[in-house]
């Protein structure tokens, strides 16, 4: 086997789990890849995605997470699983127009992405803090087995943002 053939085969193997996940996943991702780079010699990578809030225009969250490479998958198994570690940062990226959002303490999910074939995903939830007039975004791991406390937080204070509330301010 030539080096070019081996590299092509390795690329195909690396993309296979993602292709299968996309085929089996009923949820449609609204995130856009804005960055992707390798962080070690085994081909493991870091993925940066832009996630717009579907009910709050003018807000974009950037979510970063790990993507396992072929060598890592071969040596450790778990072909169809990525770690659920993530980090989030949300910013005002335009005039803020807030639609009908959940204002209870549970907030509402604005994004979810599978990190394995079954039961594991990264989710982003928005909570409105009425007291401080702040949008709170929490990125967290949803894992059935061995639930973990992997999460990160980002906030957008609405104090100087002069948002428009299309359904009226709560």
Explain the meaning of each model-derived region:
Residues 27-31:
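Sec/Tat signal peptide C-region and signal peptidase I cleavage site
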Residues 32-89:
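N-terminal secretory signal peptides
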């Amino acid at each position: 086997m030539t080096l070019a053939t081996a590299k092509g085969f390795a690329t195909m193997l690396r993309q296979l789990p993602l292709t299968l996940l996309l085929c089996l996943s009923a949820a449609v991702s609204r995130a856009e890849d804005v960055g992707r780079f390798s962080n070690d010699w085994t081909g493991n990578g870091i993925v940066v995605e832009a996630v717009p809030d579907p009910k709050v225009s003018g807000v974009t969250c950037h979510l970063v997470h790990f993507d396992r490479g072929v060598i890592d998958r071969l040596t450790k198994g778990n072909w169809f699983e990525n770690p659920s570690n993530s980090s989030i940062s949300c910013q005002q990226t335009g005039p803020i127009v807030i639609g009908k959002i959940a204002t209870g303490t549970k907030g509402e999910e604005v994004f979810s992405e599978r990190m394995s074939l079954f039961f594991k995903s990264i989710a982003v939830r928005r909570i409105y803090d009425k007291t401080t007039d702040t949008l709170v975004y929490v990125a967290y791991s949803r894992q059935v087995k061995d639930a973990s406390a992997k999460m990160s937080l980002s906030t957008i204070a609405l104090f100087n943002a002069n948002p428009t509330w299309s359904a009226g301010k709560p």
